[in-house]
């Protein structure tokens, strides 16, 4: 019997690609530990465990990461109002460091020298996985089959994988595969590739799994009161049904349910991948969309204007750091600490209506609001003397006058 090349912890999904990779790694002489993270995807985890064992995995770890994913990754993104290129709420990007961190913990526990994943050589996920692994386990060696010529020259497409699967008794799907790829977690579902690579092609009607068609969604809204403390959602109350949810996971799942029912959170975009190419992605982010709108509102109500300007810039950098895979970088740690500081007084309740694919803010209240109703009132003078505006306007007009004086002199 040939000597093992070493132990490798494989980020395993139970799908065709990683099942073939598991067998291929064994074929190359490695002992394989399969690791499957439960981050809220629709998956038969016990079936995946049995499949990995039958394919020859030495051990199988199935880790429930849902609560950790929400509290340690999604909540900081909510606090930041993190959004990539103005539209993408980063569902996949946030999940990757969460998954990879646990993969590293398992590798250290099992004294595994290697980790492996099934991310392609053109996408962002390879970067996100590997930067996390190298940050948290600098000595680790990474096996990325889709970047290895001996693998990608052998498996040039799905048909080659199917043939390999049949040869090695790897169970394959009995139903035809959708002509696109899909990635799901508790925050969102992403769809890309296949027929979606042509940016002119409309999303097929049966594509969306997390949200209903807004056109055929209920005609009556759900009214939700969302309470925040230090920028984190701590309670959701449905004012009609009088139901409440206050645990991080329960709250988020409930918002997914309500938003999905009303078709909230769909986007179809072209984005810039970190490695330089543009890609088309379709995303469903129901709960995240509600929280983004609600948090924006309570933050504007409670945060100083100049602090908010700085925080908005940091939020953009934070979104880029997440998207590009730098969650465990010193710069991302610094930005997170600044955002956490900015949220100290972001406390209050926001009332939203959820209807026909939209989230409407109806009202808000906060114990530490910077909104002064008397000061802003047209009926009460208060501490503000309208005559003071004259000097303010003249000072701000000074540079405008000088600029246009110069422009006029140039023309003459």
Swiss-Prot record:
<keyword id="KW-0963">Cytoplasm</keyword>
<comment type="subunit">
    <text>Homotetramer.</text>
</comment>
<feature type="binding site">
    <location>
        <position position="93"/>
    </location>
    <ligand>
        <name>L-citrulline</name>
    </ligand>
</feature>
<feature type="binding site">
    <location>
        <position position="88"/>
    </location>
    <ligand>
        <name>L-citrulline</name>
    </ligand>
</feature>
<keyword id="KW-0067">ATP-binding</keyword>
<feature type="binding site">
    <location>
        <position position="283"/>
    </location>
    <ligand>
        <name>L-citrulline</name>
    </ligand>
</feature>
<comment type="similarity">
    <text>Belongs to the argininosuccinate synthase family.</text>
</comment>
<dbReference type="InterPro" id="IPR023434">
    <property type="entry name" value="Arginosuc_synth_type_1_subfam"/>
</dbReference>
<dbReference type="InterPro" id="IPR018223">
    <property type="entry name" value="Arginosuc_synth_CS"/>
</dbReference>
<dbReference type="GO" id="GO:0005524">
    <property type="term" value="F:ATP binding"/>
</dbReference>
<comment type="pathway">
    <text>Amino-acid biosynthesis; L-arginine biosynthesis; L-arginine from L-ornithine and carbamoyl phosphate: step 2/3.</text>
</comment>
<comment type="function">
    <text>One of the enzymes of the urea cycle, the metabolic pathway transforming neurotoxic amonia produced by protein catabolism into inocuous urea in the liver of ureotelic animals. Catalyzes the formation of arginosuccinate from aspartate, citrulline and ATP and together with ASL it is responsible for the biosynthesis of arginine in most body tissues.</text>
</comment>
<dbReference type="Pfam" id="PF00764">
    <property type="entry name" value="Arginosuc_synth"/>
</dbReference>
<dbReference type="GO" id="GO:0000050">
    <property type="term" value="P:urea cycle"/>
</dbReference>
<keyword id="KW-0028">Amino-acid biosynthesis</keyword>
<keyword id="KW-0835">Urea cycle</keyword>
<keyword id="KW-0597">Phosphoprotein</keyword>
<keyword id="KW-0055">Arginine biosynthesis</keyword>
<feature type="binding site">
    <location>
        <position position="125"/>
    </location>
    <ligand>
        <name>L-aspartate</name>
    </ligand>
</feature>
<dbReference type="InterPro" id="IPR001518">
    <property type="entry name" value="Arginosuc_synth"/>
</dbReference>
<comment type="pathway">
    <text>Nitrogen metabolism; urea cycle; (N(omega)-L-arginino)succinate from L-aspartate and L-citrulline: step 1/1.</text>
</comment>
<dbReference type="InterPro" id="IPR024074">
    <property type="entry name" value="AS_cat/multimer_dom_body"/>
</dbReference>
<keyword id="KW-0547">Nucleotide-binding</keyword>
<dbReference type="GO" id="GO:0004055">
    <property type="term" value="F:argininosuccinate synthase activity"/>
</dbReference>
<feature type="binding site">
    <location>
        <begin position="116"/>
        <end position="124"/>
    </location>
    <ligand>
        <name>ATP</name>
    </ligand>
</feature>
<feature type="binding site">
    <location>
        <position position="124"/>
    </location>
    <ligand>
        <name>L-aspartate</name>
    </ligand>
</feature>
<feature type="binding site">
    <location>
        <position position="120"/>
    </location>
    <ligand>
        <name>L-aspartate</name>
    </ligand>
</feature>
<dbReference type="Pfam" id="PF20979">
    <property type="entry name" value="Arginosuc_syn_C"/>
</dbReference>
<feature type="binding site">
    <location>
        <position position="128"/>
    </location>
    <ligand>
        <name>L-citrulline</name>
    </ligand>
</feature>
<feature type="binding site">
    <location>
        <position position="124"/>
    </location>
    <ligand>
        <name>L-citrulline</name>
    </ligand>
</feature>
<feature type="binding site">
    <location>
        <begin position="11"/>
        <end position="19"/>
    </location>
    <ligand>
        <name>ATP</name>
    </ligand>
</feature>
<dbReference type="InterPro" id="IPR014729">
    <property type="entry name" value="Rossmann-like_a/b/a_fold"/>
</dbReference>
<feature type="binding site">
    <location>
        <position position="190"/>
    </location>
    <ligand>
        <name>L-citrulline</name>
    </ligand>
</feature>
<feature type="binding site">
    <location>
        <position position="181"/>
    </location>
    <ligand>
        <name>L-citrulline</name>
    </ligand>
</feature>
<protein>
    <recommendedName>
        <fullName>Argininosuccinate synthase</fullName>
        <ecNumber>6.3.4.5</ecNumber>
    </recommendedName>
</protein>
<dbReference type="InterPro" id="IPR048267">
    <property type="entry name" value="Arginosuc_syn_N"/>
</dbReference>
<feature type="binding site">
    <location>
        <position position="271"/>
    </location>
    <ligand>
        <name>L-citrulline</name>
    </ligand>
</feature>
<dbReference type="GO" id="GO:0006526">
    <property type="term" value="P:L-arginine biosynthetic process"/>
</dbReference>
<keyword id="KW-0436">Ligase</keyword>
<dbReference type="GO" id="GO:0005829">
    <property type="term" value="C:cytosol"/>
</dbReference>
<feature type="binding site">
    <location>
        <position position="37"/>
    </location>
    <ligand>
        <name>ATP</name>
    </ligand>
</feature>
<dbReference type="InterPro" id="IPR048268">
    <property type="entry name" value="Arginosuc_syn_C"/>
</dbReference>
């Amino acid at each position: 019997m040939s000597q093992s090349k070493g132990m490798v912890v494989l980020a395993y999904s139970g799908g065709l690609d990683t099942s073939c990779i598991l067998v291929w790694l064994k074929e190359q002489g490695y002992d394989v530990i399969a690791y499957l993270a439960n981050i809220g995807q629709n998956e038969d985890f016990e079936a995946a465990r049995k499949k990995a064992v039958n394919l020859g995995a030495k051990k199988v770890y199935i880790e429930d990461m849902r609560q950790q994913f929400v509290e340690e990754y999604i909540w900081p993104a909510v606090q930041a109002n993190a959004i990539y290129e103005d539209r993408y709420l980063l569902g996949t990007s946030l999940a990757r460091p969460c998954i990879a961190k646990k993969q590293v913990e398992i590798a250290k526990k099992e004294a595994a020298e290697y980790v492996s994943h099934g991310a392609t050589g053109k996408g962002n996920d390879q970067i996100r996985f590997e930067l996390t692994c190298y940050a948290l386990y600098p000595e680790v060696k990474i096996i990325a089959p889709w970047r290895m010529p001996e693998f990608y020259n052998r498996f040039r497409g799905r048909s080659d994988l199917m043939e390999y699967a049949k040869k090695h008794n790897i169970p394959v799907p009995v139903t035809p595969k959708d002509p696109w790829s899909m990635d799901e977690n508790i925050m969102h579902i992403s769809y890309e590739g296949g027929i979606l690579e042509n940016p002119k092609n409309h999303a097929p009607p049966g594509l969306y799994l997390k949200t209903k068609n807004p056109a055929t969604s209920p005609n009556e809204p759900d009214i939700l009161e969302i309470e925040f403390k230090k920028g984190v959602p701590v309670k959701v109350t449905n004012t009609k049904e009088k139901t409440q949810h206050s645990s991080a996971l329960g709250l988020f799942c409930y918002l997914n349910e309500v938003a999905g029912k009303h078709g909230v959170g769909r986007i179809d975009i072209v984005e810039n991948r970190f490695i330089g190419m543009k890609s088309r992605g379709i995303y469903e982010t129901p709960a995240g969309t509600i929280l983004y709108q609600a948090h924006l509102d309570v933050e504007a109500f409670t945060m100083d204007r100049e602090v908010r300007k700085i925080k908005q810039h940091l939020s953009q950098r934070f979104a880029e750091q997440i998207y590009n895979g730098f969650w465990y970088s010193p710069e991302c740690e610094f930005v997170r600490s600044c955002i956490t500081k900015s949220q100290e007084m972001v406390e209050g309740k926001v009332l939203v209506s959820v209807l026909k694919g939209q989230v409407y803010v109806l009202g808000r209240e906060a114990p530490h609001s910077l909104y002064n109703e008397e000061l802003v009132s047209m009926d009460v003078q208060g501490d503000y003397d309208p005559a003071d505006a004259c000097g303010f306007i003249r000072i701000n007009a000074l540079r405008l006058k000088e600029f246009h004086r110069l422009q006029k002199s140039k023309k003459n």
